[in-house]
């Protein structure tokens, strides 16, 4: 009986080398004062206004080092370590209209376990049209002999790590966010990316919302990009999540079947 190798990957983010012009939330947590997400957000905004073209070589250097670590360890599908991002969520948001990174809003998160000031949603969310994924993917893939996996945050996770001052309707907000994610995915597909990970750890924390919004996310994020392998990443801490993953698989198959039938017709 022929054995099939189980392919390996990493979740996504890696610590940033100190020579980079940015730090992320978790890098700041390693400092003496602990995690300071507000400071990191403000500093990244300032960096965006004053970044240099020469910084690109530093990002490529960091990505190359991080990819090499994974390849040397035998990882089949490496990531670039998300080295261009201040965290795995807000980098996507910075490419959308509707977000305010200048006037942050205070919020209490994680069932009261954490409080901070977050970027605010002050108008309708839509993509600016300046897609980041093609450049980031091509730059990283050029450094790897194996296929690079690209990571994008899911709508629920974005919603839980930003301050909604406009929608007051989680379903509408989720729909608009899902549309921006789908646009980035389409551009990744055009560039030849074959492994895309949608990060949705909030599925496990907000199971009711996951049930309410998951089918819409499947339609807007997954089904429109059938030519690639897309993984939904979450932390299964609720027994309902285990049941829901079975439903997701069934819904994906149904959506694919309906999509193909409609294409034939």
Question: PLM features: residue spans?
Answer:
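Domain-level signal for soluble alpha/beta catalytic cores
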Residues: 1-265
């Amino acid at each position: 009986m022929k054995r099939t190798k189980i392919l390996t990957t990493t979740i996504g983010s890696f610590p940033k080398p100190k020579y980079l012009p940015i730090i992320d939330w978790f890098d700041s947590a390693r400092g003496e004062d602990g995690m300071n997400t507000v400071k990191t957000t403000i500093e990244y905004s300032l960096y965006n206004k004053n970044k240099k073209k020469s910084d690109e070589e530093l990002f490529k250097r960091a990505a190359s080092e991080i990819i090499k670590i994974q390849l040397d360890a035998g990882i089949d599908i490496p990531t670039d370590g998300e080295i261009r991002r201040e965290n795995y969520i807000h980098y996507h948001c910075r490419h959308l209209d509707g977000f305010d990174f200048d006037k942050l809003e205070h919020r209490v998160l994680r069932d009261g376990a954490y409080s901070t000031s977050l970027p605010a949603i002050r108008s309708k969310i839509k993509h600016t049209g300046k897609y980041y994924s093609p450049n980031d993917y091509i730059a990283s893939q050029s450094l790897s002999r194996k296929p690079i996996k690209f990571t994008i945050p899911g709508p629920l996770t974005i919603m839980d790590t930003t301050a909604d001052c406009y929608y007051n309707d989680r379903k509408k907000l989720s729909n608009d966010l899902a549309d921006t994610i789908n646009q980035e995915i389409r551009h990744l597909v055009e560039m030849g990316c074959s492994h895309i990970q949608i990060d949705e750890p909030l599925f496990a924390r907000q199971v009711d919302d996951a049930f309410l919004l998951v089918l819409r996310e499947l339609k807007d994020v997954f089904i429109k990009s059938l030519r690639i392998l897309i993984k939904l990443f979450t932390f299964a801490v609720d027994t309902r999540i285990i049941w829901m993953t079975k439903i997701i698989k069934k819904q994906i198959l149904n959506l694919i079947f309906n999509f193909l039938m409609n294409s034939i017709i």
